[in-house]
Amino acid sequence: MPKLKTKSGTKKRFKLTASGKVKRGQTGKRHGMIKRTNKQIRNKRGTTIMADADAARVIKNFMPYA
């Protein structure tokens, strides 16, 4: 049986931490910044850790060798 490929969109969007958690970028900063408060915009910087239930789905379906 051939090797499974990791989804190319998953490679670009997610990284695994050393402890096996899934790190992802923050959502909600593509457009419409004028209506958001400065605090909201500031708190959306950087990355965050994905929830366990969602992370399990990402790893199982899209990252076969993670």
Swiss-Prot record:
Please list the GO biological process terms of this entry. translation
Keywords per UniProt: Ribonucleoprotein, Ribosomal protein
One Gene Ontology cellular component term attached to this UniProt record is: cytosolic large ribosomal subunit
Q: Which Pfam families match?
A: Ribosomal_L35p (PF01632)
Checking InterPro entries in the record gives: Ribosomal_bL35 (IPR001706), Ribosomal_bL35-like (IPR021137), Ribosomal_bL35_sf (IPR037229)
GO molecular function term, any single one: structural constituent of ribosome
Q: NCBIfam families attached here?
A: rpmI_bact
Which family is this sequence assigned to? Belongs to the bacterial ribosomal protein bL35 family.
- Name listed for the protein in its UniProt record: Large ribosomal subunit protein bL35
Q: Which organism is it from?
A: Parvibaculum lavamentivorans (strain DS-1 / DSM 13023 / NCIMB 13966)
